[in-house]
C-alpha cells in the first residue's frame, strides 16, 4: 500500500481539541517532525481535518 509523508509545520497550541487528537493519531509530536503513514481513508480523514497545520507529500 502507498505511503504519505506528513510534516507538522504549525504549533498545536490553542487548536481545536479534535484537531490536536488527529495530529497525535498520525504520530506527530513537534514542529518539523515528519512521519510516513499508510494512505488509508482513516489517515486521509485525519489529514483533511487538520490540513492547515500540515505539509503532505506523496
Curated annotation (Swiss-Prot):
Name its species: Pseudomonas syringae pv. tomato (strain ATCC BAA-871 / DC3000)
- Keywords, alphabetical: Ribonucleoprotein, Ribosomal protein
Q: Which InterPro entries match?
A: Ribo_uL30_ferredoxin-like_sf (IPR036919), Ribosomal_uL30_bac-type (IPR005996), Ribosomal_uL30_ferredoxin-like (IPR016082)
Give the protein name, as stated in the record.
Answer: Large ribosomal subunit protein uL30
Pfam families membership = Ribosomal_L30
Q: What are the GO BP annotations of this UniProt entry?
A: translation
Q: Which NCBIfam families match?
A: rpmD_bact (TIGR01308)
What residue ranges are annotated as transmembrane? none
Its Gene Ontology cellular component terms are: large ribosomal subunit
Summarize subunit and interaction data from the UniProt record for this chain: Part of the 50S ribosomal subunit.
Q: Provide the GO MF annotations for this entry.
A: structural constituent of ribosome
Give the UniProt family note.
Answer: Belongs to the universal ribosomal protein uL30 family.
